[in-house]
Amino acid sequence: MSRFRPLKVIAKIRESRLITSFHLAAGNVPLEGFKPGQFLVFRIATPHGEVVRNYSLSGSPDALGHYRISVKREDLGGSSQYLHDHVQVGDSLLAEGPRGAFVLDEAGNRPVVLLSGGVGLTPMVAMLHRLVKGTRRVLFLHACEGGDVHALRDEVEALVATRPGLSAHFCYRTPSDQDRQTKRFHSEGVFTREQLQSLLYLDDYDFYLCGPPPFMAAMYQTLCSLGVPKTRIAYEFFGPATVLEAAANPAPKPFVAAPSEGAITVEFRKSGITTDWTGAADSLLALAEDMGLSPEFSCRAGICNSCKSSITAGEVDYFEDPLDDLSPGEVLICCSRPKTSVVLEL
């Protein structure tokens, strides 16, 4: 049964040369609240066929009655081009959600660093909207090519001006002459280890990291080199997903202990590996990676079906419901954990 419902475009606002925001409402039907950092899933009927895409919610989670997504126009992105060129105020888009586990830890009390690259700032802006209402110290760090592609800058500047303890730093890779005249950026080039070290006070921060894979890999390695514990870094990719820790530190083939008697076990039958499920991995996909396997994946959120695998024994629980119905004997390993001992054809 489809969980998609139509959302009407009530406003369309160009935020930069490449990014446009769409404000969405559901008429008289209340919209589900969302956690800062979550996204909506869209089925978009482009001239070349229907596509499924995720777009982060970029507005305030306290703005009841409507959602906002901010979409970057991609050269090879049929869905983003369609949204930019053809979708107008009054049109409807089919959406499902909110979804996603990349969310602000609102119960925490540590200072927060929101570190983004390009259109990766969109979930960070939603987080900033929530953080300004509290007392935690927040540093909003954003990197992009220049002022013409810097979306939501005025909004971020207004938010960090609302109370003490909030600040922003914008790094432009190739600032224009106009950027230099207006002086609305703080540094030039890319965020370096030395620069991040100078911006961060000696403290125990929670880091949230979002952007394209090259930016993410560089920033993750830099933060780790500064001694930031990996448990303090939450991240989400904009673009093809990968595993940051594996990219930064290729791991040797792991030692696989013999399964314990009475434990829930996971058997990767084709690989000849059986191991205990201890709960240390956050999903069956993560466990497979811990065992040195390389299953296909992309979204890590139950949406793209890239990780769909055959399960020949046992049951799983989904912590994120699959977007599409699965046939008997199929499982999405990116968003599931074993309920009983399981056998996967991997």
Spans of features found by a protein language model:
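Ferredoxin-reductase
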Residues: 2-92, 109, 144-147, 157-159, ...
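Short flanking/linker segments adjacent to small metal-binding domains or redox-active Cys/His motifs
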Residues: 174-175, 341-346
